[in-house]
């Protein structure tokens, strides 16, 4: 006879735990924050560069002016500005200009006293305009000016295109024709003759020489007085009689006399005046200028193109929003100078890899994400970890990481806006001081740069603070997302961890990270299937009744034994029974 006994064994599985976590990194970087000082992070975005010196170049996307008149050979920019006979040419329009002459000279024309007037500024003033043209007609009739008639003087040291005696096109050397006598101050009005609403730059001056030459030319050996006035700006001069070295300061031809040259800027419709005595250089052709061209000290030739022109470093291509090193004026799409290197956090706080189960124990590993990070979050900063019989599984939450990246991008954009505002502020200051572009107070400029540098550094510190502090925000969002997905299939045990009622291996965790997790799918195998075992009993002389008798006897004996043991324990606990053990 054969009997079958069916044994039902229910095998339950150990629960897994899922936690939110942060990635780890083996190459920490350091950023500065507003309140935490220096903090190690998993990644940074360098915001500064230290440039090296290079040649000057043309600014990208705009016309850059080197020499005022590129086609005027053997001419300085001052020659062009004064209208030297052999230096008459077209000045091309430009949005940017290079101040390449440290000390302007006239290159063989009449010697000028550079230390007496604003003559050095004249070429620089013209460089500051985008469009520059010389008028086709004279602003006044010099021959018939008050105190005349005059002969228009020329000089062999200022030859014209035919190598005859000549003089500057912007001025007429008014030498009395017949009445070579002393005169009281005379006044001439200078009208506005530009036709396109431009600024009118009117050049004028006076001649000084030895007493002998002054009497010969003008009939008066005494110092002469001169005054110019335009737009509320008045300038006074008294001529010097004699005492000039034979060799000119600019290396030109030997001369006993000198000329002093000045200019005045007349706004549209405004009339200027010149009060003069003998030896006056009356204005003739005038410059009509419009638009703005940014000016910077540099050198020629211009080679290639660059984003930025920097007085100390030459042509720069902008790779970072800020730079460290030597501060100086710059034009174009330039980085802003800051005192120290700046870095923006591009990741999370640095955490060493969390220890695994065998090193720290089960509950130690669960808490690992609080003080350590998890390796394996490919392309992600925040994510999930699963701990169980399968070991440790890790998956990145790319959406959360993207949100963190978006916040960093927003911080970068905010810093860029701050950069643009500061650049506009600097440009505005440059425009306001346009007419004295070479006279900017370096101390004031450095103070402005220091202030802007401090503002930018503080903005970066605050940005880093916000990025690092946002980790808690991202982890809390992940925790809410995880709790919603797990639903009733898990129990919240705190600290961003959940104990599941089912297994959660790498596949399960990947689906959670991807947002495709279905609790029902993984909850089905919470209990293993019933294991049904068939026991075959052979006929060896025992009948069914005998077997049942043995089974019932054993079960009854076990029940009685348990009851007696429980009774003894109860009596001992009530002190009704004592037990002594003797050896």
Swiss-Prot record:
Q: Where is this site: Cleavage?
A: 360-361
Q: Which GO terms describe its cellular component?
A: host cell plasma membrane; membrane; viral envelope; virion membrane
Please list the residue ranges that the record places on the Cytoplasmic side of the membrane: 573-583
Cross-referenced InterPro entries, in alphabetical order?
Answer: Capsid_hemagglutn, Hemagglutn_HA1_a/b_dom_sf, Hemagglutn_influenz_A/B, Hemagglutn_influenz_B
**Gene Ontology terms describing biological process:** endocytosis involved in viral entry into host cell; fusion of virus membrane with host endosome membrane; fusion of virus membrane with host plasma membrane; viral budding from plasma membrane; virion attachment to host cell
Spans within the Extracellular topological domain:
16-551
Q: Which pairs of Cys residues are joined through disulfide bonds in the record?
A: 19-497, 75-87, 109-158, 504-508
Keywords of the record: Disulfide bond, Fusion of virus membrane with host endosomal membrane, Fusion of virus membrane with host membrane, Glycoprotein, Hemagglutinin, Host cell membrane, Host membrane, Host-virus interaction, Lipoprotein, Membrane, Palmitate, Signal, Transmembrane, Transmembrane helix, Viral attachment to host cell, Viral envelope protein, Viral penetration into host cytoplasm, Virion, Virus endocytosis by host, Virus entry into host cell
Q: Which residues form the signal peptide?
A: 1-15
Give the positions of lipid attachment, kind S-palmitoyl cysteine.
579, 582
Read off the SUPFAM superfamilies from this record. Answer: Influenza hemagglutinin (stalk), Viral protein domain
Which function does this protein serve? Binds to sialic acid-containing receptors on the cell surface, bringing about the attachment of the virus particle to the cell. Plays a major role in the determination of host range restriction and virulence. Class I viral fusion protein. Responsible for penetration of the virus into the cell cytoplasm by mediating the fusion of the membrane of the endocytosed virus particle with the endosomal membrane. Low pH in endosomes induce an irreversible conformational change in HA2, releasing the fusion hydrophobic peptide. Several trimers are required to form a competent fusion pore.
Family, similarity comment:
Belongs to the influenza viruses hemagglutinin family.
Other facts noted in the record for this chain: Major glycoprotein, comprises over 80% of the envelope proteins present in virus particle. The extent of infection into host organism is determined by HA. Influenza viruses bud from the apical surface of polarized epithelial cells (e.g. bronchial epithelial cells) into lumen of lungs and are therefore usually pneumotropic. The reason is that HA is cleaved by tryptase clara which is restricted to lungs. However, HAs of H5 and H7 pantropic avian viruses subtypes can be cleaved by furin and subtilisin-type enzymes, allowing the virus to grow in other organs than lungs.
- Subunit comment: Homotrimer of disulfide-linked HA1-HA2.
**HAMAP family, per the entry:** INFV_HEMA (MF_04072)
Name of this protein? Hemagglutinin
């Amino acid at each position: 006879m054969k009997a079958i006994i069916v044994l039902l064994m229910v095998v339950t599985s150990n629960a897994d735990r899922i936690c939110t976590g942060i990635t780890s990194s083996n190459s920490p970087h350091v950023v500065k924050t507003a309140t935490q000082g220096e903090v190690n992070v998993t990644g940074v975005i360098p915001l500064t560069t230290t440039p090296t010196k290079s040649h000057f170049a043309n600014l990208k996307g705009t016309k850059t002016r080197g020499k005022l008149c590129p086609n005027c050979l053997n001419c300085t920019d001052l020659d062009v500005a004064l209208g030297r006979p052999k230096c008459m040419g077209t000045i091309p329009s430009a949005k940017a200009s290079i101040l390449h002459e440290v000390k302007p000279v006239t290159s063989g024309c009449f010697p000028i006293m550079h230390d007496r007037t604003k003559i050095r500024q004249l070429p620089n003033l013209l460089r500051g305009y985008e469009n520059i043209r010389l008028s086709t007609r004279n602003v006044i009739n010099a021959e018939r000016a008050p105190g005349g008639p005059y002969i228009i003087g020329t000089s062999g040291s200022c030859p014209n295109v035919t190598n005859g005696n000549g003089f500057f096109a912007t001025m007429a050397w008014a030498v009395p024709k017949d009445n070579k006598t002393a005169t009281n101050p005379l006044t001439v009005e200078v009208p506005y003759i530009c036709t396109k609403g431009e600024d009118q730059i009117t050049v004028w001056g006076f001649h000084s020489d030895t007493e002998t030459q002054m009497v010969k030319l003008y009939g008066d050996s005494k110092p002469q007085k001169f005054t110019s006035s335009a737009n509320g700006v008045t300038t006074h001069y008294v001529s010097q009689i004699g005492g000039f070295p034979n060799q000119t300061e600019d290396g030109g031809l030997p001369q006993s006399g000198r000329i002093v040259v000045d200019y005045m800027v007349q706004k549209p419709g405004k009339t200027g005046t010149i009060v003069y005595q003998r030896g006056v250089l009356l204005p003739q052709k005038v410059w009509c200028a419009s638009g703005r061209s940014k000016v910077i000290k540099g050198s020629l030739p211009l080679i290639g193109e660059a984003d930025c022109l920097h007085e100390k470093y030459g042509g720069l291509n902008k790779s970072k929003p800020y730079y460290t090193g030597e501060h100086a004026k710059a034009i174009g799409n330039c980085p802003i100078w800051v005192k120290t290197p700046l870095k923006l956090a591009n990741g999370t706080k640095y955490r060493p890899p969390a220890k695994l189960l065998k090193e720290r124990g089960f509950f130690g590993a669960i808490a690992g994400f609080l003080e350590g990070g998890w390796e394996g979050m490919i392309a992600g900063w925040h994510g999930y970890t699963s701990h169980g019989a399968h070991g440790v599984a890790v998956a990145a939450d790319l959406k959360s990481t993207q949100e963190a990246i978006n916040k960093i991008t927003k911080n970068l954009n905010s810093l860029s806006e701050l950069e643009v505002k500061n650049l506009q502020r600097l440009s505005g200051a440059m425009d306001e001081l346009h007419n004295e572009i070479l006279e900017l107070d370096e101390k004031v400029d450095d103070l402005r740069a220091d202030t802007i540098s401090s503002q930018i550094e503080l903005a970066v510190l605050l940005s880093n603070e916000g990025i690092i502090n946002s980790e808690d925000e991202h982890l809390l969002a992940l925790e809410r997302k995880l709790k919603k997905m797990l639903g009733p299939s898990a129990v919240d045990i705190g600290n961003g961890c959940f104990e599941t009622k089912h297994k959660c291996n790498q596949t399960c965790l990947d689906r959670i990270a991807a947002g495709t997790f279905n609790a029902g799918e993984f909850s089905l195998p919470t209990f293993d299937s019933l294991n049904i075992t068939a026991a075959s009993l052979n006929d060896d002389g025992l009948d069914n009744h005998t077997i049942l008798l043995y089974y019932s006897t054993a079960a009854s004996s076990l029940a009685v034994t348990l009851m007696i043991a429980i009774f003894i324990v109860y009596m001992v606990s009530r002190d009704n029974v004592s037990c002594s053990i003797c050896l």
